[in-house]
Amino acid sequence: MKKTLLLLTAVFLLRTFSLHAFDFGLVFSQDAETDVPAFDFERTGFYIKGVLTPRFTARLGGKGSLYVSAAVSYEADPSDETDSFTVIPELTRTDVNFNFGIINLNAGRMFYGDPLGITADGLFDGALVSVVTRFGNIRAGAWYTGLLYRDRAKITMTSDEMESGGEKVDYENFADTYFAPSRVLAAVEYDHPSLAGFLGLKASILAQFDAGGGNLNSQYLTAALSVPLKSVIFDLGGCFELIEYDGKVTPAFAADIGLTFVLPTKLEKHIKLSWRYSSGVSEDETVGAFLPLTTVPQGEIVEAKLSGLSLLSLGFTGRLAKPLSAEAAFTYFIRNDLGTYRYYPVTEGDSEGFFLGAEIYGRLVWNITPGIRLNFGTGVFIPALGDAMPEADILWRVKLNMVFSIF
């Protein structure tokens, strides 16, 4: 009986996963980062992180596919004498996909992002249905966040979530320190790549509900337009939010405008000028601070949450040679109220200034081989270029990242 059962199982697997339908991969990423306040090397902070990510893909008959990936990461902080080494396991993207002509079904742990990439962006557990038509593409999905790894989910909508988000994983209190806050979100999207032959359109309605016993819910109406011309790309987007908290409904706003100039060079290069805005609390409190579901870091040094902030940025991205590319950006940070953003460089004292300062950052990416990539980045944040806390220390950061891939 046991032999018969094993034989039937083998036949089922062979029929399900057709020949040459398997694929394995492995990625190892090693990061080293240091912060030097005011170029004082005696106050240098050093941080190391590595991530090992295996993946497996397979076809499920003629219409489906399976993707499984996981991650084991370690974090080390040599300056922390109490707990300088932590190993963290994680289930990353793991989903099944079935295609039935114009209808596509995706279920499991998947990546999702709103049209602007500022409200919800990352891994979520749930299902997504997509329909492709000649009039555009329609998607509808629902997801849950409470089983995600907290540090990857980056859900910090409330002050309690913000505080707990900075805690390290404690295996003696695993459930309270590992998992992300419990929230349910649902979204309906529409996009058309070329309306009238030249206009790209994306729009979505997204709602998130507190499933962890709290009472903070929010809804988002987002739209993004893209107009590609011969050597210029114009992007315009906006988000209208309703925040429900303690029985009160407050509107909030965000906007994103970008102008990208494609340079007439042999190797791809472009310059981008952009402005990103998120409302702060108005004086009469009729408008609230924009509150995204996930925290998408703004800047490479400040890594600010897009809430009550505006950013003006001028950046360059391009290939210097076939295996070598570079990025450089100048970003200026402005507060839109005096109470929402209370982090570096305004962590101490009362500040009446709105201008936080400027970040200058550059990165080199060297594709040494198809399976080895080296990233080197460095930059500074200069509070003296603003009036919020001009006497605060300059913060210098250096990042080194090496990625090894086996396909």
Feature locations, PLM:
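Transmembrane beta-strands of outer-membrane beta-barrel pores
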Residues: Q30-V36, A70-A76, I102, R109-G113, ...
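Outer-membrane beta-barrel translocator/channel fold
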Residues: D35-A38, R139-G212, G238-A252, W275-L291, ...
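Surface-exposed loop and membrane-interface regions of Gram-negative outer-membrane beta-barrel proteins
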Residues: P37-G50, A58-L105, F111-D121, E244-T250, ...
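Residues that define the transmembrane beta-barrel architecture of outer-membrane proteins
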Residues: E42-L52, V87-T92, A120-D125, A180-A186, ...
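Outer-membrane beta-barrel architecture
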Residues: T53-T57, D95-N97, L128-S130, L185-D191, ...
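Repeated loop/turn-to-beta-strand initiation elements of outer-membrane beta-barrel proteins
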Residues: G62-V68, F100-N106, F135-A140, L195-A203, ...
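Extracellular/periplasmic loop regions
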Residues: G237, D246-R319, P323-G349
